[in-house]
Amino acid sequence: MTATLLDGKATAAEIKDELRVRVKALAERGVTPGLGTVLVGADPGSQAYVNGKHRDCAEVGVASLRRELPTDATQEQVDAVLADLNNDPACHGYIVQLPLPAHLDTQRVLELIDPDKDADGLHPVNLGRLVLGYPGPLPCTPRGIVELLRRHDVALRGARVVVIGRGNTVGRPLGLLLTRRSENATVTLCHTGTLDLTAHTRAADIVIVAAGVPGLLTSDMITPGAVVVDVGITRVIGPDGKGRYTGDVDPGVGEVAGALVPMPGGVGPMTRAMLLTNVVERAERG
């Protein structure tokens, strides 16, 4: 591989070091940032994901507020937990772990989150704030991508950026972040309806792939020296019958790109660091 690897794990560790200092300053004011998690059911993957969030909290001094409900919890019970977190001054932000059991109204649950305590930054109100340029919690994965590029001195101002994928958690909000005046990139959002995807990616300085299609971006689709960010994560079964996770970027891209954000070890750690950042910022605002 000739591409320079942009290490999200190391960068996230730097951010956590900075957050520890900020959390200590808050403690001197008598404030302890608190992150809440709402977990309904006992799915092992969801439990592991939530446990990882609370390990991150412990690393930087953020308090953990766990709310766990059985799989058969009623809509009213879930609503009550969210109301409690919305009104709890010890909670500065929280997430609802998805997916929820099928009998629950996911959209209703997400919209019940107090937008100011929306640690994921994906509440409709906060996405609207992003569109309008108003302050508010920012979506964690897009924010993490921008922060990772910035901390590795990847020029964004005036850069031609192609984002592949128009999902509400990454693609759409990422385009909004990159076109803010503070970034000033020129963004093309590609998707399943895009004609001649390669023509777009070959013209780009930066290609960010968040489509959930393993190996979608290949080495012949980029210009030599381009920056490539792999956001995709898909579980596939290998020839040996064992499951593994793979990204949207073919390994051969590393021989052509100038810099590569890999999967794993790239965007994932940055997403988690930005979740903590959103909570600490909320505590700092009071």
Curated annotation (Swiss-Prot):
<dbReference type="InterPro" id="IPR020630">
    <property type="entry name" value="THF_DH/CycHdrlase_cat_dom"/>
</dbReference>
<feature type="binding site">
    <location>
        <position position="192"/>
    </location>
    <ligand>
        <name>NADP(+)</name>
    </ligand>
</feature>
<keyword id="KW-0368">Histidine biosynthesis</keyword>
<keyword id="KW-0378">Hydrolase</keyword>
<feature type="binding site">
    <location>
        <position position="233"/>
    </location>
    <ligand>
        <name>NADP(+)</name>
    </ligand>
</feature>
<keyword id="KW-0486">Methionine biosynthesis</keyword>
<comment type="function">
    <text>Catalyzes the oxidation of 5,10-methylenetetrahydrofolate to 5,10-methenyltetrahydrofolate and then the hydrolysis of 5,10-methenyltetrahydrofolate to 10-formyltetrahydrofolate.</text>
</comment>
<comment type="pathway">
    <text>One-carbon metabolism; tetrahydrofolate interconversion.</text>
</comment>
<keyword id="KW-0511">Multifunctional enzyme</keyword>
<comment type="subunit">
    <text>Homodimer.</text>
</comment>
<keyword id="KW-0028">Amino-acid biosynthesis</keyword>
<keyword id="KW-0658">Purine biosynthesis</keyword>
<dbReference type="GO" id="GO:0000105">
    <property type="term" value="P:L-histidine biosynthetic process"/>
</dbReference>
<dbReference type="GO" id="GO:0035999">
    <property type="term" value="P:tetrahydrofolate interconversion"/>
</dbReference>
<dbReference type="GO" id="GO:0004477">
    <property type="term" value="F:methenyltetrahydrofolate cyclohydrolase activity"/>
</dbReference>
<dbReference type="InterPro" id="IPR036291">
    <property type="entry name" value="NAD(P)-bd_dom_sf"/>
</dbReference>
<dbReference type="InterPro" id="IPR020631">
    <property type="entry name" value="THF_DH/CycHdrlase_NAD-bd_dom"/>
</dbReference>
<keyword id="KW-0521">NADP</keyword>
<dbReference type="GO" id="GO:0009086">
    <property type="term" value="P:methionine biosynthetic process"/>
</dbReference>
<comment type="similarity">
    <text>Belongs to the tetrahydrofolate dehydrogenase/cyclohydrolase family.</text>
</comment>
<dbReference type="InterPro" id="IPR000672">
    <property type="entry name" value="THF_DH/CycHdrlase"/>
</dbReference>
<dbReference type="InterPro" id="IPR046346">
    <property type="entry name" value="Aminoacid_DH-like_N_sf"/>
</dbReference>
<dbReference type="Pfam" id="PF02882">
    <property type="entry name" value="THF_DHG_CYH_C"/>
</dbReference>
<dbReference type="GO" id="GO:0004488">
    <property type="term" value="F:methylenetetrahydrofolate dehydrogenase (NADP+) activity"/>
</dbReference>
<dbReference type="GO" id="GO:0006164">
    <property type="term" value="P:purine nucleotide biosynthetic process"/>
</dbReference>
<feature type="binding site">
    <location>
        <begin position="165"/>
        <end position="167"/>
    </location>
    <ligand>
        <name>NADP(+)</name>
    </ligand>
</feature>
<protein>
    <recommendedName>
        <fullName>Bifunctional protein FolD 2</fullName>
        <ecNumber>1.5.1.5</ecNumber>
        <ecNumber>3.5.4.9</ecNumber>
    </recommendedName>
</protein>
<dbReference type="GO" id="GO:0005829">
    <property type="term" value="C:cytosol"/>
</dbReference>
<dbReference type="Pfam" id="PF00763">
    <property type="entry name" value="THF_DHG_CYH"/>
</dbReference>
<keyword id="KW-0560">Oxidoreductase</keyword>
<keyword id="KW-0554">One-carbon metabolism</keyword>
